[in-house]
């Protein structure tokens, strides 16, 4: 059985969020097209995601070094490792997220920090880091109200680019993508822009 992890990185309802609308469309179509797959949903706005602070970092580093952790270090390290284990156990992963203030929501950033662990998702070598997660299929569903694919705001796009770079660091270099942009910049075209993205998400879900 194929294990599929759906990650939603937006707490708004679908009628107020294009990325959540894409998520729900993709999820519904995927379940319809792949009825035998084991689907797990992770809502990062409902999940327990402690801030990636010095105590958590210390605990994770002590684990690698084989040192004794304090109770709080162990508690936080266990949380991070729990999310990482879930990520690594999935055969396919779908991530839906917006561009907020040129970046990604803080909850999503924290989650990605949990995953970025040497010896688990990548390893250091004399020639630089090498990704260790090369066996996963990834779909990225990204929405941004402005135009960031080209033009004066291109260099400000640090949501999709950031996530793609993190995944490439893990060894996942060719994710599937559905990008919806410009629906706020071009309100007269918003309905058509969002409709086209929804159709693209549904079609990708069928073959993902």
From Swiss-Prot:
The species this protein belongs to is Listeria innocua serovar 6a (strain ATCC BAA-680 / CLIP 11262)
| Details of cofactor binding | Binds 1 FMN per subunit.
Tell me a Gene Ontology molecular-function term this record carries.
oxidoreductase activity, acting on NAD(P)H, quinone or similar compound as acceptor
Matches recorded under Pfam families: Flavodoxin_2
Q: Which Gene3D superfamilies match?
A: 3.40.50.360
Alphabetically ordered keywords of this record: Flavoprotein, FMN, NAD, Oxidoreductase
State the family named in the UniProt similarity comment for this chain.
Belongs to the azoreductase type 1 family.
Q: By what name is this protein known?
A: FMN-dependent NADH:quinone oxidoreductase 1
User: Subunit structure, briefly?
Assistant: Homodimer.
Keyword 4Fe-4S on this protein?
no
Q: What is its EC number?
A: 1.6.5.-, 1.7.1.17
Top-level EC class: oxidoreductase
**Which gene does this sequence derive from?**
azoR1
Free-text function comment from the UniProt entry: Quinone reductase that provides resistance to thiol-specific stress caused by electrophilic quinones.
Q: Which residues make up the binding site for FMN? A: 17-19
Cofactor(s) in the UniProt record: FMN
Q: Which reaction does it catalyse?
A: 2 a quinone + NADH + H(+) = 2 a 1,4-benzosemiquinone + NAD(+); N,N-dimethyl-1,4-phenylenediamine + anthranilate + 2 NAD(+) = 2-(4-dimethylaminophenyl)diazenylbenzoate + 2 NADH + 2 H(+)
